Amino acid sequence: MCMIDHLDDIMDAGIDCIKIEGRAKSAYYAAIVTGAYRHVLDDVAAGREVDPVWRDEVEHVSHRHYSTGFYYGQPGQYYDNSRYIRDWQVCAVVTDCDADGNATLSLRNKFAAGDEIELVGPDSRPFTMTAPVMHDLEGFELYEPRTPQTVFKMKLPRYVPPMSFVRHAVSLGAKD
């Protein structure tokens, strides 16, 4: 279920508290979805036009086909495909970053220098960049860190707060 496109209706109905449904959601999932909903709720409450980037963000997490559940009647069962959609993957988590963008990260999934990646963090729109050559903690160049939890250094174009995510499109489509 996804109600991000209908938060105005929810607020008009007098509902002032919502929650994410589901079990065992990752920190990435919780951060992306709550951030997107928070931005849309703030826009709706302020009477501003909703920035479409926040709707797009909920497509960047692992999910099944989205629906509005029973909010607008009984839509019937969705039989076409119950597989998860996993078109984006977390590559790394920023653990530290200075004002110049010199960041320390912890690897989650492999990626390589030259890959197109996105950085997404609290209170900021995602931004796209090309992954630079990285360095291990001893200063040696890393072109493709592969071992999960590897700590490495990477130059970012600007400061990003700790717990920001590096992600990339995986072009794998829906998988079980």
Can you annotate each of these PLM segments?
Residues 1-176:
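Surface-exposed amphipathic alpha-helical tracts and adjacent flexible/coil segments at the periphery
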